[in-house]
Amino acid sequence: MSARHSTTALPRRFSRTLLACALLPLGLLAANMATAAPLQAQPAATAADNFGPLKHVNAGVLDVAYVEQGPADGPVVILLHGWPYDIHSFEQVAPALAAKGYRVLVPYVRGYGQTRFLSAATPRNAQPSALASDVIAFMDALHIQRAVLAGFDWGARTADIVSALWPERVKALVSVSGYLISSQEAAKAPLPPSAELQWWYQYYFATARGQAGYEKNRHAFAKLIWQTASPKWAFDDATFERSAKALDNPDQVVITVHNYRWRLGLAQGETRYDPLEAKLASFPSIGVPTITLEGDANGAPHPPAEAYAQRFTGKYEYRLISGGIGHNLPQEAPQAFTQAVVDADHL
């Protein structure tokens, strides 16, 4: 079930504390937004891979591996995964959208799966504007002018950024956990101890020990994140291992570590992205039609909906998805996610 609210139903006046939650990556606090008694989490999907063969396209600095479903002339939807997940988060969403006539594209992010850098000389950079630029390059390579963007975790942040910086390329947006645009300057602000604790892995990755630990224990590390971010999701080992294979990418560790170090100002990006990061540091509004989603059992740090509602200035809805739904919302609640994509497209 989902609780649906229009933008007018959300408060337009909020405190500095709530605003600060929206400005840091994935927010600062885990908010309890459930409106009913928790229900049992949905069982994990079968481990059978229904995606079919991967396609590849050279896009910008990458050889992007992606899945495509649906009619070639259908309206385009691009689904963006997060960390430490992969394209199988959308295994049920993609065919459902394809059945409705959409051309669905699900790319592996740089550093995941079969996506590869075209040159060994390219910096293994994972700053937010670089990931967003990858989406634009992917669209350009496939001659796609506009698309509906939908994502969670890193994918939601990337979709937010593309929508803010290139709104002419985005028909509509679906973002789990809302407005996730941030800056290195905003990340300098210390958080309450309980909030800092939720970001333990970010600080772990800031150390040489953390990088070595992730390199040595990629799958075990990812499983721990899955369990804490979705505490009521009963995924099985086969489901997890299918996605965990994407973390065997040779650039996975350096990409993940760079992403989190960059957020804290501990790693540099590329100067060519400086103009984009400067725009993002002003926390631009998003004017494209948008639906934001939240699971009622999201164990990852995330901002309350009231903290970011004002950032969406176009047609907007917020939906709380109940039933013990955690951070990997498209895989845990595929019907709700699919419906949000269709509805956002028609806002």
PLM feature spans:
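Conserved HGGG/HGGXW glycine-rich cap/lid loop of the alpha/beta-hydrolase fold
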Residues: E68-F117, Y308
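Flexible "cap/lid" subdomain of the alpha/beta-hydrolase fold that forms the substrate-access gate
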Residues: A37-F51, V61-V64, Q69, V76, ...
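N-terminal secretory signal peptides that target proteins for export/translocation
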Residues: M1-F14
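Bacterial N-terminal signal peptides
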Residues: L18-N32
